[in-house]
């Protein structure tokens, strides 16, 4: 038995450790994009407990980035049935609270019921399973390749989860098409129609079967040591297709979870956001310029002052991995293992921002330095919000493609390619997605009272270079180099370097505020 456990763990490490390899490169000319579009989902699959919407992964800009995008909505007491994918995923919780779980091969069942909780056929049965986690609005959840994942909404507010699948990951040994392997049901695969558009062949006569459907009944009877009736349910025989990938659970699920976490999450993220806004004035000291210049010094005290049992939990679970320090005295010094890896981190409005200007907005990022599991996935993310007429200065992603999904409001974005051509100059509004290829320059200005977005990035340590403002590329060039490069007088070059005192986020001009009032 010990050998089997060791073998399973070795397989799991091989499965996840391979992510250190580079992503596969796009085919020639795939990223020579002369035009970008803000895209809406173009496929919708209804289920008993919600719906799944998908964007076409064959679209040129998604093919350039090597990703697929989908959005799931779960109503109260809705369960997204367990499935696994051929590529790693980042899931952002746009709205709602609930539970999620993953199954890692070889890891122990660390959650169990008390002995008196259930009885059957004269003997006590105690349910045991791997860890179940809570999620809340603003969370990023990392799902490795081939790992079974499920989620459940136990609240009245619908859960909206936006998922990016990195189909160009080196861990995807199939074709460049996202695939979901469901453990139950007989519903339609959400990306199946795009596979047909690409010229793929039908893999089965019935394209809605689950992973058990193709096995003979007697194989499954022997494998599970159960009767044929249970096997028929396992294979989804005679099940209504309308149930779909998201099913309603009558009476709700009974989930083993620490009671203090349940109470904390039942308060919901809205209360946390209200508390966050009440504390905001504490940090609005000094001029707007000082706010940005002192962001590094203020970040740690602000983080410590945040109420946030969730923030404290995140900090404890993340431990010293960000700074290479041990989580606590007496720690054995080992790297966090697959079985105990932290799988989520909150980057939403209730989290402590990395970049903050009270008159312009805020930005929060998560990389593998914050959430080490992202090192396996080779992905990271960014959440930001802009006040009306505030601008995110022109910048570019050093080492990643960026898929920007608008959460709320609308903004005008401009994107420029290597030839100096504008490939996008338009509005990005809530529910739409825009791909910004690596090194393409982009700037954004909010057209709403508050524009918020999440950006998925195809590198676990994605970085940006700013083209304007303090500490930007232009600002860090010698004055004479700037003057000679742009054919400017020295005083003009000095203005170009120093007139914008802000690093990232530029507040609206007073004239713009008056015009919008």
Curated annotation (Swiss-Prot):
- Residue ranges spanning the membrane: these are none
Every Cupin type-1 domain range: 36-232, 345-494
The keyword Signal belongs to this UniProt entry's keyword annotation: yes
Q: Which InterPro entries match?
A: 11S_seedstore_CS, 11S_seedstore_pln, Cupin_1, RmlC-like_jellyroll, RmlC_Cupin_sf, Seed_Storage-Functional
Q: Which Pfam families match?
A: Cupin_1
Per its UniProt entry, which superkingdom is the organism in? Answer: Eukaryota
| UniProt-listed Gene3D superfamilies | Jelly Rolls
The cysteines joined by S-S bonds are 31-64, 107-339
Where does the signal sequence lie?
1-21
* Ranges where the record places region Disordered: 249-335
Q: Name one GO molecular function term.
A: nutrient reservoir activity
Instruction: Check the record and name the PROSITE patterns matching this protein.
Output: 11S_SEED_STORAGE (PS00305)
Q: Which UniProt keywords apply?
A: Disulfide bond, Seed storage protein, Signal, Storage protein
The UniProt subunit note reads as follows:
Hexamer; each subunit is composed of an acidic and a basic chain derived from a single precursor and linked by a disulfide bond.
The task this protein performs is described as: This protein found in the seeds of many leguminous and non-leguminous plants is the source of sulfur-containing amino acids in seed meals.
The record's similarity note reads: Belongs to the 11S seed storage protein (globulins) family.
Q: What name does the UniProt record give this protein?
A: Legumin A
């Amino acid at each position: 038995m010990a050998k089997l456990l060791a073998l399973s763990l070795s397989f799991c490490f091989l499965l996840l450790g391979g992510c250190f390899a580079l992503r596969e490169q796009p085919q020639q000319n795939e990223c020579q994009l002369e035009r970008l579009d803000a895209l809406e989902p173009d496929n919708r699959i209804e289920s008993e407990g919600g719906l799944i919407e998908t964007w076409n992964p064959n679209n040129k800009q998604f093919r350039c980035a090597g990703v697929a995008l989908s959005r799931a909505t779960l109503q109260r007491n809705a369960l997204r049935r367990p499935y696994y994918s051929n590529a790693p995923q980042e899931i952002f919780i746009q709205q709602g609270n609930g539970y999620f779980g993953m199954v890692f091969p070889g890891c122990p069942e660390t959650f169990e019921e008390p002995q008196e909780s259930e009885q059957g056929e004269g003997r006590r049965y105690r349910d045991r399973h791997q860890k179940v986690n809570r999620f809340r609005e603003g969370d990023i959840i990392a799902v490795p390749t081939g790992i079974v994942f499920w989620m459940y909404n136990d609240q009245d507010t619908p859960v909206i989860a936006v998922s990016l699948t990195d189909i160009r990951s080196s861990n995807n040994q199939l074709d460049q098409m996202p695939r979901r392997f469901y453990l139950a049901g007989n519903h339609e695969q959400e990306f199946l129609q795009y596979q047909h558009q690409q010229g793929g062949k039908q893999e089965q006569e019935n394209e809605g079967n689950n992973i058990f459907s193709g096995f003979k009944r007697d194989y499954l009877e022997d494998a599970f040591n159960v009767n044929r009736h249970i096997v028929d349910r396992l294979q989804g025989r005679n099940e209504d297709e309308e149930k779909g990938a998201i099913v309603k659970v009558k009476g709700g699920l009974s989930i083993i979870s620490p009671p203090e976490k349940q109470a904390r999450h039942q308060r919901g993220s809205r209360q946390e956001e209200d508390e966050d806004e009440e504390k905001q004035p504490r940090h609005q000291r000094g001029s707007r310029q000082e706010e940005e210049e002192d962001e590094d010094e203020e970040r740690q005290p602000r983080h410590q002052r945040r109420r946030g049992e969730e923030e404290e939990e995140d900090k404890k679970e993340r431990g010293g991995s960000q700074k290479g320090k041990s989580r606590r005295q007496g720690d054995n010094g080992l790297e966090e293992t697959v079985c105990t890896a932290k799988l989520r981190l909150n980057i939403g409005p209730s989290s402590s921002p990395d970049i903050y200007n009270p008159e312009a907005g805020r930005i929060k990022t998560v990389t593998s330095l914050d959430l080490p599991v992202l090192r396996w996935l080779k992905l990271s993310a960014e959440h930001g919000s802009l006040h009306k007429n505030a601008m995110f200065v022109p910048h570019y992603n050093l080492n990643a493609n960026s898929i920007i999904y608008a959460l709320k409001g609308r903004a005008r974005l401009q994107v420029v390619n290597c030839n100096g051509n504008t490939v996008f100059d338009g509005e990005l509004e809530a529910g739409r997605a825009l791909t910004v290829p690596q090194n393409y320059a982009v700037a954004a200005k909010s057209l709403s009272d508050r524009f918020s977005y999440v950006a998925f990035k195809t590198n676990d340590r994605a970085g940006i270079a700013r083209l304007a403002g303090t500490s930007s590329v232009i600002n860090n060039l010698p004055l004479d180099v700037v003057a000679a490069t742009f054919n400017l007088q020295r005083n003009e070059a000095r203005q170009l370097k120093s007139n914008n005192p802000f690093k990232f986020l530029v507040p609206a001009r007073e004239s713009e505020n008056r015009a919008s009032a």
